[in-house]
A protein has these predicted regions:
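A short beta-strand element within the Helicase C-terminal
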Residues: 327-343, 349
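Conserved SF2 helicase motif VI
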Residues: 344-369
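Conserved interdomain linker/interface between the two RecA-like ATPase lobes of SF2 helicase motors
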Residues: 104, 114, 124-243
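Residues immediately C-terminal
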Residues: 47-50, 79-82, 110, 327-328, ...
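Conserved helicase ATPase motor motifs in RecA-like P-loop NTPase domains
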Residues: 77-80, 91-117
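The feature captures the C-terminal accessory region of ATP-dependent helicases
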Residues: 203-231, 235, 241-258, 263, ...
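Conserved C-terminal RecA-like helicase domain
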Residues: 1-42, 57-59, 64-71, 187-320
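SF2 helicase catalytic motif II
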Residues: 46-49, 60-95
């Protein structure tokens, strides 16, 4: 049986002999050996989570074997949604049970999650020690470190949760103190301001949002830019919570005229592009937004010189309109940002992309991050607004959804990780809900991990290992379906066409008869002096890859043209639209 997805390509050319070879030698492709032998394996958590979530079919075996022979590094573990945290705890518990070390890497680790992951790991390690360590003294080796300091080596052995909490609190206290001292020495790089949405009852919420964002973009460019003798430029990030509303607002923005003597260049960045096109966008942004050398932005290869040369206007505003994919994992340096709020965590993480590489020579004269006072769900009058992404749920909610009423000024001016990593000192609520967004998030995390109906703690505090009921009730990535689609091009003279890989039969079959409807947007209304930043025509990108890999255009699509669509509960819409510069999206209800 092939326990590895047939479409998964493994790039590794090192030795493939290992301690488990006698069990894997019958697999002729050696892909399993490659994944087990690679000294460092980099993957998304989706490839590892089957180790504890798989209940049938054998797909969990490879993840289990890899964790049996390796340590585990989790980058941004707190980026997962509330419903996925129990599965994360189960994975850490399993790593402890196998005797693996676990490293948690994040600048925004909330206390509740730190405590839950310690408890789950300790419970697993206790089982490992029982089988492998004679006379274990109940201690677990733990350490904390950041760019300022490391925890005391002498106190590395932790006996129980109380001892862990003491060490963690001391480390967080030292970190917050170091952050404050740094702000005293250097001007804060990221200062927020809550920017009120201008509402008009005669227009849709999306239009009100687009008008406000356009105004914010122009204001931020005026105050935060780079200049030379001929041009004034700025590169900003507009973050929105969900892809379909993001595209709806993008369409409205590109239809608005740019201010006088100004050119606006837009890029829509989210996860619903074929892999090749998303990779192309990310490569472009990675290069241009690496601003460790301030002068590189004016160059042709590393900057925007080519774009500037094609337009005579003096002011050029480059706007990346992004979903939450822009918050983590990208080493980008923007001049400013506009944020549709979802959570305190997303605000802090996104702020880390503003002035990321450069140092300020003087104090900011005005805020460089505008937090919209409401998100689109609030504008539409929905009862639960900070969810998917966010922490609200029917039984745990906020009393208000206007940031001006649920954030204190010191939580966004300046913006740093302090609100996220510091334990809350007081809880304020009224009959309608909690009164502070940051405190509410800490409460929601603790509820999900330790006291909720489907709390994560049940895994290590009880013994549910003999069945898959916990995994069934606490599903990781809780979606109805996840189907693979491919954008294929037969040759350079034919238009791209969507295909569906039917995995419901064996072997899987590629067909043009897709379960969903794909439409192509041919034209868009564009305002004066408004352009798309990059050429994202599939044939251009595919042709370059065909040359690079010496393969045919159709093979490029089959290898790099995948886009997986997850069908979430409550969404019965099966009609999608595709535009080369907007990606795949669905129309939103503009009530």
């Amino acid at each position: 049986q092939d326990i590895l997805d047939a479409e998964l390509y493994v790039d590794y050319s090192g030795p493939t002999s290992h301690s488990l070879s006698k069990w894997t030698k019958y697999h002729k492709t050696k892909r399993i050996d490659k994944l087990l032998c690679a000294p460092v394996l980099v993957s998304t958590i989706d490839h590892l989570i089957p180790a504890t979530e798989g209940t049938k079919g054998g797909k969990q075996i490879l993840a289990m074997l890899r964790l049996l022979t390796a340590d585990l590094v989790l980058d941004e573990p707190d980026d997962l949604g509330l419903s996925d945290l129990p599965a994360l705890c189960r994975l850490v518990n399993w790593a402890g049970m196998l005797g693996s070390k676990v490293l948690l890497s994040t600048a925004t680790m909330p206390p509740a999650l730190a405590y839950a992951l310690y408890e789950s790991y300790r419970a697993g390690w206790a089982q490992y020690a029982k089988a492998n360590l004679d006379g274990w003294n109940q201690n677990v080796c733990c350490t904390w470190f950041d760019e300022f300091t490391t925890s005391d080596y002498k106190n590395r052995f932790i006996f129980d949760l109380a001892g862990y909490k003491n060490q963690h609190r001391q480390f967080v206290k030292n970190r917050i103190s170091a952050l404050k001292k740094e702000q005293e020495k250097k001007p804060p790089k990221r200062v927020g301001e809550i920017f009120s949405i201008q509402k008009c009852d005669e227009t849709s919420p999306e239009k009100n949002l687009a008008n406000t964002i356009h105004q914010a973009v122009c204001i931020l460019h005026k105050h935060h830019h780079e200049r030379n003798d001929e041009k004034i430029i700025s590169i900003g990030l507009v973050r929105m919570a969900n892809i379909n509303p993001l595209i709806a607002v993008t369409k409205l923005l590109i239809a608005m005229d740019a201010p006088e003597d100004t050119c606006i260049h837009y890029c829509a960045y989210h996860s619903r592009y074929p892999l090749a096109i998303r990779s192309h966008i990310e490569n472009k942004l990675d290069t241009i937004l690496n601003r460790k050398d301030k002068s590189s932005i004016w160059e042709t290869e590393k900057g925007v010189a080519d774009t500037l040369a094609g337009h005579p206007q003096k002011n050029h505003i480059f706007v990346v309109l992004a979903s939450p994919v822009a918050e983590v994992g990208r080493d980008h340096d923007y001049d400013w940002a506009v944020v549709e709020p979802s959570s305190m965590r997303s605000i802090i993480q996104l702020a880390g992309r503003v002035v990321r590489h450069r140092e300020l020579s003087e104090q900011l004269k005005s805020p460089n991050i505008f937090l919209l006072n409401e998100n689109l769900k609030a504008l539409k009058g929905q009862r639960i607004c900070f969810e998917r992404p966010g922490f609200e749920m029917p039984r745990l909610g906020l009393a208000n959804h206007d940031l001006k009423k649920i954030l204190d000024i010191d939580q966004y001016n300046p913006i740093d990780s302090t609100p996220r990593i510091e334990e809350i000192k007081e809880i304020q609520k009224n009959p309608n809900g909690y009164l502070n967004l940051n405190a509410f998030e800490h409460i929601a995390l603790a509820w999900q991990l330790f006291s909720g109906d489907k709390k994560a703690k049940v895994w290590w505090a009880n013994t549910p290992y003999w069945c898959g009921e916990v995994q069934r009730q606490q599903r990781f990535r809780d979606s109805i379906d996840d189907e693979p689609y491919y954008l294929l091009i037969e040759n350079e003279y034919q238009n791209p066409r969507w295909h569906w890989l039917n995995e419901n039969q064996y072997p899987p079959v590629m067909t043009t008869e897709t379960p969903v409807t794909f439409n192509t947007l041919q034209t868009l209304e564009m305002g004066d002096n408004v352009h798309f930043w990059f050429d994202l025509a599939p044939v251009t990108i595919y042709s370059q890859l065909a040359d690079d890999f010496a393969i045919e255009l159709r093979d490029v699509g089959q290898r790099f043209g995948e886009l997986r669509i997850a069908e979430y509960s409550g969404n019965d819409n099966q009609e999608y639209w595709y535009h080369k510069n907007l990606g795949l999206h669905q129309e939103v209800n503009k009530r």
